[in-house]
A protein has these predicted regions:
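Compositionally biased, intrinsically disordered low-complexity regions enriched in proline and serine
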Residues: 29, 34, 45-47, 142, ...
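Conserved N-terminal alpha-helix of the aminotransferase class I/II PLP-enzyme fold
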Residues: 32-81, 86, 102-109
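N-terminal glycine-rich, Lys/His-bearing helix-loop that initiates the first secondary-structure elements
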Residues: 1-44
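Conserved PLP-enzyme active-site core in the AAT-like
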Residues: 9-11, 70-269, 274-275, 279-285
């Protein structure tokens, strides 16, 4: 049975695996785990490689994005840094020209030093993206909407373009969140999140996520994740989705909804799929 996004935000993966029957997932602070006996495992060995609380958050994010697996990182930049480890010297990426500064800094310094090149183009124009593809292009990286100029790309069309040339499509879904946009259902291979923003409310925690549907890609990323160690802290994991739960309260307080294609912006059909903003009532009834 598929649950609504609101239910997933509140209930998580709904897997009640706590041995003491806790309804809310406990925050497991331990670094290591005791096993029942020689050759017997609880499924957890060391918290860098796996933690019950972190696993619950990862499953919840995967469900929200309609992916199969997710990995929770200490920050959004840690997630992107780990993702770049799937590429090799000589590989080429195409990316949105209006992009978060931290991502650009990573590419212009560390990725460049490692022999990976990135060309930033106007990804709101599919033909411009197509013209930038080279034989060594391994991925197209979109922010849609972009940070900070809110440019929108056609995820489905660019996914088809990337796959036709043997590459993958990566989509940073931070600005819309899985509530409004699910790139994996439109053909993306990897979804990136800075969970610090809308998933958690931008006030309490730092986090990042990678979400995928392909098992081989997940295994590759999970190996990088366990090896490099930029995993999510246990206590911080416990605060994940407080912003999403707050959203359920705020939603009842909306006075007016704005749809970008109705307010003088480019009325191309692709705008209808992505952008929404709202006015909040002056007084919120509890």
């Amino acid at each position: 049975m598929a649950f609504a996004a609101e239910t997933i935000c509140v209930q998580g993966s709904n897997e009640r695996r706590d041995p003491f029957g806790a309804i809310s997932m406990p925050i497991y602070q331990n670094a290591a785990y005791a096993h029942p006996g020689l050759g017997q495992s609880t499924g957890y060995d060391y918290s860098r490689c796996g933690n019950p609380t972190r696993d619950e958050v990862q499953k919840t994010v995967a469900l929200l994005e309609q992916g199969t697996e997710a990995l929770a990182f200490s920050t959004g930049m840690a997630a992107i840094t780990a993702l770049m480890e799937i590429f090799f010297p000589g590989d080429h990426l195409i990316a949105t020209d209006d992009l978060y500064g931290g991502t650009l800094r990573l590419w212009n310094t560390i990725s460049h030093k490692n022999g990976i090149s990135v060309d930033c183009v106007d990804t709101s124009n599919v033909e411009t993206v197509k013209a930038a593809i080279r034989p060594e292009t391994k991925a197209i990286y979109l922010e849609t909407p972009s940070n900070p100029m809110m440019k929108v790309a056609d995820i489905q069309a660019i996914a088809e373009l990337a796959h036709a040339h043997g590459g993958i499509l990566i989509v940073d879904n931070t600005f819309l969140s899985p509530y409004f946009q699910k790139p994996l259902t439109l053909g993306a291979d990897v979804v990136v999140h800075s969970g610090t923003k809308y998933l958690e409310g931008h006030n309490d925690t730092l986090s990042g996520f990678l979400v995928v549907k392909d098992d081989a890609l997940y295994q590759q990323l999970n190996n990088i994740y366990k090896t490099t160690g930029a995993c999510r802290l246990r206590l911080i994991v416990g605060y994940c989705f407080e912003g999403s739960r707050l959203w359920l309260y705020v939603w009842s307080s909306i006075r007016k909804m704005l749809w970008r294609s109705h307010t003088g912006w480019n009325r191309d059909r692709k705008w209808r799929k992505y952008i929404i903003s709202v006015w909040i009532r002056d007084r919120i009834r509890r």
